[in-house]
A protein has these predicted regions:
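Inter-motif core of Ras-like GTPase G domains
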Residues: 22-28, 44-64
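Glycine-rich phosphate-binding loops of nucleotide-dependent enzymes
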Residues: 36, 49, 162-165
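Conserved beta-strand segments of the P-loop GTPase G domain that flank and frequently precede/overlap
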Residues: 33-34, 57-61, 87-89
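Short glycine-/polar-rich loops that comprise or flank the Walker A/P-loop
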Residues: 8, 51-56, 80-85
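Single conserved hydrophobic/aromatic residue that forms the stacking wall/gate
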Residues: 1-8, 12
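C-terminal lobe/tail of nucleotide-utilizing enzymes
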Residues: 74-173
């Protein structure tokens, strides 16, 4: 029977989350971002229980299939007392010779924003559209945050400014 082992896995995931949140010294963070896989929302529910003031940022890509899943993930806010702060669209475009190429289509983030706003009864804004940048992957694989230069300063190029704008929106009350 598959159900008992799935349930046990959920228990271990929740315990791991609780240990992660309690054993790591966070200082006084302004924002703590947890990257949760889309799906049933079990982890989002666990986060809401462990962090009562948690808010949700839904991340999608432009494709309709991805935005449909993102809407379902955002609707977990109806099950728990969690506000959806906004939507981020990842891999929105690839810039080549000054032209923005929409490799994966367009509009997924806006669709998610509109559908969640309608379903939840409040504005769920599209907070950022992040470009597809091979350099971000390379920097991540090297173990460095993609928003920082080699010297540790915040990047001042397009991706740095995009992330700065997103951070400012997340910190705004």
């Amino acid at each position: 029977d598959v159900a008992p082992s799935r349930g046990l896995g959920d228990v271990y995931k929740r315990q791991s989350l609780e240990q992660f949140l309690s054993d790591v010294w966070w200082g006084e963070p302004d924002v703590l971002l947890l990257d949760l896989a889309p799906g049933t929302g079990d982890m989002a529910i666990s986060v809401a229980q462990a962090l009562p003031n948690a808010e949700l940022v839904v991340v999608t890509t432009p494709q309709p299939s991805a935005s449909d899943i993102a809407v379902r993930s955002g609707l977990v806010a109806l099950q728990v007392p969690m506000k959806v702060r906004g939507v981020v669209e990842n891999m929105s475009y690839y810039e080549h010779k000054g032209e923005k190429l929409e490799i994966f289509g367009a509009g997924g983030g806006q669709r998610v924003s509109e559908q969640l706003s309608a379903a939840l009864g409040y504005d769920v804004p599209l907070m950022a559209q992040l470009p597809l940048e091979p350099e971000v992957r390379e920097i991540g694989e090297a173990g460095r945050p993609a928003v920082l230069d080699v010297d540790g300063a915040l990047r001042t190029d397009g991706i740095g400014q995009t992330f700065r704008g997103l951070a400012e929106r997340l910190l705004a009350v």
